[in-house]
């Protein structure tokens, strides 16, 4: 089992680089890195397809957090194959260069990765601690305000209505995928007829005309108030106020097999609302084109994050709620 504090690293590089990184991870108490794989120079020069297949077999059930490539030894074919493979698994990619590379790719900014200077493949503002602090402060302030001003009196009121609509709990806890692929329990007001979990463990998507939705559930869903308990998730550290919406476990696996770079959305905490949500791409869907648009907006949010963007999304979400224009069902 991979704990939150552990980060798994795989390296495409020389034996010298492997020794340097291994020594650093063993000696540095702050690294929180587990160097779990390595391919040396000769391996890198073999057929890319063979190498990726070999790599897949080796770590079939492994979660990869960081994928380090010595870009001075890699051609464009292997580079493309490597990044497609790594990003499909939700890994961050870092390029280390021992000598000038002939590769012509648009890359991110230089940063320190362990003992190396590296170039990240994607712009990721929330990788900076100051930005993480800003986002966490915004999350905690807004969540505390919502819980103290609204949730404390809204819960017993809506709880009575939920109980009158049928048997079952007031708040349900659903398994969802969070940051770095960590599973967590997402809280929501119950909006559907209470059923025992299916024997196959699969949770089915809700559609617009789903007869399982109760009368009070329709109101809660239309106004997004069913997600009010998720502000507790924010204070618990599972979620953020703004971010990609959390997907169900079985849904996550299915989408990852169909949409490239889907798991990049794991780079940040899932949110109560998000850029994709305010653009109208929300709710369950089996339409791959709509899902692709949602993922595109999620990645755009990750790469262009700013505190102002979070504030803007929160304001737009609130406006959509009070004007009953949430696109929810």
What annotation goes with each model-predicted range?
Residues 1-151:
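N-terminal hydrophobic signal-anchor/signal peptide
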Residues 100-110, 171-212, 273-294:
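Short, glycine-rich, amphipathic interfacial segments at transmembrane boundaries or analogous
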Residues 130-195, 233, 307-329:
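A hydrophobic, helix-centered structural microdomain
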Residues 206-269, 313-317, 321:
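A short, structured surface patch at a secondary-structure boundary
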Residues 259-329:
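C-terminal terminal-structure detector
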């Amino acid at each position: 089992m991979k704990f939150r504090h552990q980060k798994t690293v795989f390296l495409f590089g020389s034996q010298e680089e492997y020794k340097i990184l291994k020594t650093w991870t063993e000696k540095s108490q702050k690294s929180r890195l587990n160097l779990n794989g390595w391919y040396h120079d000769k391996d890198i020069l073999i057929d890319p397809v063979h190498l990726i297949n070999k790599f897949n077999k080796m770590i079939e059930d492994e979660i990869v957090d960081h994928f380090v490539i010595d870009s001075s030894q890699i051609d464009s074919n292997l580079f493309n194959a490597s990044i497609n493979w790594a990003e499909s698994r939700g890994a961050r990619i870092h390029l280390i260069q021992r000598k000038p590379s002939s590769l012509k790719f648009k890359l991110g900014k230089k940063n320190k990765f362990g003992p190396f200077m590296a170039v990240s493949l994607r712009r990721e503002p929330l990788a900076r601690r100051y930005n993480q602090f800003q986002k966490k402060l915004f999350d905690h302030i807004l969540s505390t305000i919502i819980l103290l001003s609204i949730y404390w009196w809204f819960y017993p009121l809506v709880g009575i209505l939920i109980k009158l609509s049928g048997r079952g709990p007031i708040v349900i806890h659903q398994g969802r995928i969070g940051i770095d692929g960590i599973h967590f329990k997402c809280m929501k007001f119950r909006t559907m007829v209470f059923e025992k979990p299916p024997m196959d463990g699969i949770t089915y998507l809700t559609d617009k005309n789903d007869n399982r939705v109760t009368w009070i559930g329709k109101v809660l869903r239309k106004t997004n108030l069913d997600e009010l308990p998720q502000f507790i998730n924010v204070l618990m550290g599972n979620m953020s106020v703004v971010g990609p919406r959390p997907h169900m476990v079985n849904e996550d696996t299915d989408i990852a097999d169909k949409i490239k770079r889907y798991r990049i959305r794991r780079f940040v905490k899932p949110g109560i609302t998000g850029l994709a949500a305010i653009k109208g791409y929300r709710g369950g869907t089996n339409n791959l084109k709509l899902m692709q648009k949602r993922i595109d907006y999620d990645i755009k949010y990750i790469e262009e994050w700013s505190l102002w963007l979070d504030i803007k999304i929160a304001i737009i979400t609130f406006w959509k709620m009070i004007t009953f224009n949430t696109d929810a069902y």
